[in-house]
Design a protein with these regions (language model features):
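Secretory/extracellular carbohydrate-interaction modules
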Residues: 22-98
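Short tryptophan-centered beta-strand motifs in secreted/extracellular beta-sheet-rich domains
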Residues: 121-139
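Bacterial N-terminal signal peptides that target proteins for export
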Residues: 1-8
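N-terminal signal peptide c-region/cleavage motif recognized by signal peptidases
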Residues: 16-19
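Short, aromatic/His-centered strand-loop micro-motif at the edge of beta-sheets
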Residues: 100-126, 146
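Flexible glycan-contacting loops in extracellular carbohydrate-active proteins
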Residues: 148-174
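Bacterial N-terminal signal peptides
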Residues: 8-14
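Surface-exposed coil/turn segments at beta-strand junctions on protein surfaces, enriched
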Residues: 42-46, 116-120, 130
Length: 179
């Protein structure tokens, strides 16, 4: 069985189960100091957005950290948002996963979640949203995931998810599952 057959089979199963599934592929090349949205989707019901990211090149400078960012937000300005990001230190340092949340543009949570050796720029991140308001997040390097964690009461309802890139060149393969 090929990967495309497996994906088609899984998509058919999810459709029968009342789950919508979609696959997206992005290539990005965002210069240092710039921030670009690669994808945005409204979030009806419960669902998840998961991405495998492959970084080819990082553009570094004094002020900005090169990163790919997943966001779960209530408003278009993303003043009420959870951001899950990953970046590396210059000169081959470890990969760090970082969580930040904002309510009315004020920072609420800002913490490093996990550090791991960088696996040639390949890593995974996911956010999930729930009708009860909770937001889940998960991350990993190469083929393994860390345990899913939650912000039970973020102070806002997720109305859309988005993917952003800043100071990086690479690709992302993403899957959206929604009920």
């Amino acid at each position: 069985m090929t990967l495309s057959h497996a994906v088609a089979g899984l998509s058919a199963f999810l459709l029968v189960a009342g789950v919508q599934a979609a696959e997206y592929h992005f290539s990005f090349d965002v210069p240092y100091g710039q921030y670009e949205r690669q994808f945005k989707m409204k979030t009806p019901g419960d669902g998840s957005l998961s991405c495998t990211v492959m970084i080819e090149k990082e553009y570094r400078g004094e002020k900005w950290v090169p990163a790919v960012i997943l966001a779960a937000a209530e408003d278009d300005a993303e003043d009420d948002t959870l951001f899950l990001s990953s970046s590396t230190e210059p000169n081959g340092g470890p990969r760090t996963f970082h969580l930040r949340t904002f309510n009315q543009a004020k920072p609420i949570i800002d913490k490093a979640l996990w550090e791991a050796p960088d696996e040639k720029g390949v890593y995974k991140m996911a956010v999930s949203w729930y009708a009860n308001g909770a937001i889940g997040y998960q991350y990993g390097v190469y083929a393994s995931w860390q345990e899913k964690q939650f912000v039970e009461k973020p102070g806002f309802a997720t109305r859309h998810v988005s993917i952003h890139a800043s100071g990086v060149k690479g690709t992302a393969f993403c899957y959206v599952h929604a009920k």
